[in-house]
């Protein structure tokens, strides 16, 4: 992908929407983590927060954005729309998705560490250890699915190669 300025913390609570046209972003907050990087890393990070109606109960219970509501895009629809609008492409979206999940797991771990060591007392953080494990499992599932797909593709190529080999 190409390099650009990435925000590094895209979430609904970091954008200001136009009250007269709530689908129009008129401001972006929280730029302290901005840097130069791959725009698909930003997308992967943003979608790690994206909870869909089909996600497991842990993600639904800890959801902090309205991404599950009727009419909202699925993660895949967001990716497809983003790639279409930007003209970018990727042969390995799973890499970016897993990166975003790993990044979110690290953030959750940092928050839980502070809660566990009584550096913060917000009760919302007491069960973050569960979220960390759920994110880990979600990342492993995505990696596993990608390996299965890669293996199936490899098997097709091997079969095709065998057809082309002299007997």
Residue spans for each PLM region:
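Pocket-edge positions in alpha/beta enzyme catalytic cores
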Residues: 35, 67-70, 124-127
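Regulatory N- and C-terminal appendages and interdomain linkers associated
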Residues: 106, 110, 114-167
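All-alpha amphipathic helical-bundle segments outside canonical DNA-binding/catalytic cores
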Residues: 89-100
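Conserved NTP-binding catalytic cores of kinases and kinase-like/nucleotidyltransferase enzymes
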Residues: 4, 16-26, 87-90, 147-167
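Conserved acidic
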Residues: 2, 74, 92
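Active-site activation/catalytic loop segments of kinase-like enzymes and analogous catalytic loops
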Residues: 41-86, 100-118
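Active-site acidic catalytic loop and adjacent metal/ATP-binding pocket
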Residues: 1-41, 45-47
């Amino acid at each position: 992908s190409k390099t650009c300025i990435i925000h590094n913390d895209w979430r609904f609570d970091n954008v200001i929407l136009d009250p007269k046209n709530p689908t129009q972003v008129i401001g972006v907050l929280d730029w302290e983590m901005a840097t130069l990087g791959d725009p698909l890393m930003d997308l992967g990070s943003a979608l790690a927060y994206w909870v869909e109606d089909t996600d497991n109960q842990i993600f639904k219970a800890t959801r902090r954005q309205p991404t599950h509501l009727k009419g909202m895009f699925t993660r895949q629809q967001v990716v497809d729309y983003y790639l279409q609008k930007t003209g970018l492409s990727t042969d390995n979206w799973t890499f970016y998705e897993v990166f975003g999940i790993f990044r979110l797991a690290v953030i959750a771990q940092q928050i839980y560490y502070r809660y566990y060591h009584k550096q913060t007392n917000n009760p919302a953080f007491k069960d973050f250890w569960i979220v960390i494990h759920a994110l880990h499992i979600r990342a492993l599932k995505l990696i596993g699915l990608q390996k299965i797909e890669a293996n199936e593709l490899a098997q097709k190529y091997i079969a095709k190669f065998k057809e082309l080999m002299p007997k």
